[in-house]
Amino acid sequence: MSSNPARLFVIAAPSGAGKTTLVKLLLERNPGLEFSVSYTTREKRKTEVDGRDYFFVDKERFLELKEDGELLESAQVFGNHYGTGRSQVEQHLEKGNHVILEIDWQGARQVRESMPDCVSIFILPPAREELERRLKDRGTDSDEVIARRLQEAEGDMTHWDEFDFVIVNDDLDIAVGELEAVVDGKGDANRSSSPELRQKLESILV
């Protein structure tokens, strides 16, 4: 990984784009990176661990954190609250470590306002049909919830041009390699301003 000064990398994506899997692989391959664990009020899934995947708290505790200014950003998604602890991020950066923050586009917008020096990355699926397949393959949601998530995801994807970089998660190995390149300061091919990338996105965002 790069020896560049510590940066905060904000990674967002529509539901089902493979963001969580990409971030997991990135962290496994680069143990020097720090993962910012977010707070949430949603129910813990069977495979999740408190303090590793999220800090699971009730609504009252979440609102206390928000009121006390302890959250760098917060958002409400599908009726659940999500937020990033400010002190955790700042401590990692002060130690000289890159920090990876996995959130939604709303939270990313707030983080950019609070920390303009952050690097923002948006993950896209290769096609709408692939997004729908991935959501169904999770096996955790009803058809009604999947339909709602798909509709929400389509709206989320319209915000891609707010981000510094865009990665299309078609091939997992290629996508994580592109993510590593961005963190390493060598991801120019994935800049959202790239004409070649914009042309590629036209076929996805129709």
What are these regions (language model features)?
Residues E28-S36:
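Post-Walker A helix-loop "phosphate-sensing" segment adjacent to the P-loop in P-loop NTPases
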Residues T158-V206:
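NTP-dependent small-molecule kinase module
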Residues V99-D104, E113-D137, V168-N169:
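Conserved phosphate-donor/acceptor-positioning beta-strand/loop module used by diverse small-molecule
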Residues A12-P14:
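P-loop (Walker A) phosphate-binding loop of NTP-binding proteins
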Residues M1-L8, P31:
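Extreme N-terminal, non-catalytic leader segments
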Residues L22-V23:
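Post-Walker A alpha-helix
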Residues S38-V99, W105-R109:
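ATP-dependent small-molecule kinase phosphotransfer cores
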Residues K19:
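Conserved lysine of the Walker
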